[in-house]
A protein has these predicted regions:
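The DNA-recognition helices of helix-turn-helix-type DNA-binding domains
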Residues: 44, 55, 70, 83
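Residues within the helices of the helix-turn-helix
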Residues: 24, 35, 64
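Alpha-helical DNA-recognition elements
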Residues: 50, 54, 65
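Short, charged recognition helix plus adjacent turn
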Residues: 3-13, 77-94
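Short, solvent-exposed alpha-helical "recognition" segments
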Residues: 55-61
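Short amphipathic helical patch at the helix-1/turn junction of helix-turn-helix
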Residues: 17, 28-29, 57
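Short alpha-helical DNA-recognition segment
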Residues: 29-50
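DNA major-groove recognition helix of helix-turn-helix/homeodomain DNA-binding modules
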Residues: 61-78
């Protein structure tokens, strides 16, 4: 019995892929380049690029930075779950 498979049809790679796509969509909806968005978070622009291109999994530390950032916190739920307000449809930022 594989309880992980039975509990959820989603896997970590699938979740990360969806999150990285939403991360890029959020950045683009804010009209920010990778370097400017990365600077806003305090991470190297190459790290952000690696997240967006799926070369590296988005770490918990980066997610925490987003959750605590005054311009991004309102998008955290959407970013991590895909539920809620899509910033591209709202004309982010909020």
């Amino acid at each position: 019995m594989n309880s992980q498979t039975e509990q959820s049809n989603l896997t970590i790679p699938t979740l990360n892929d969806a999150c990285r796509q939403r991360l890029r969509k959020l950045r683009e909806s804010m009209g920010l380049s990778r370097p400017k968005f990365a600077d806003m978070l305090g991470i190297p622009s190459t790290t952000l690029k690696n997240y967006e291109l799926n070369y590296r999994e988005i770490g918990g530390g980066t997610l925490l930075l987003i959750a605590q950032h005054p311009m991004l916190a309102s998008h955290f739920h959407w970013l991590t779950t895909g539920q809620g307000n899509d910033p591209a449809k709202l004309g982010a930022p909020q």
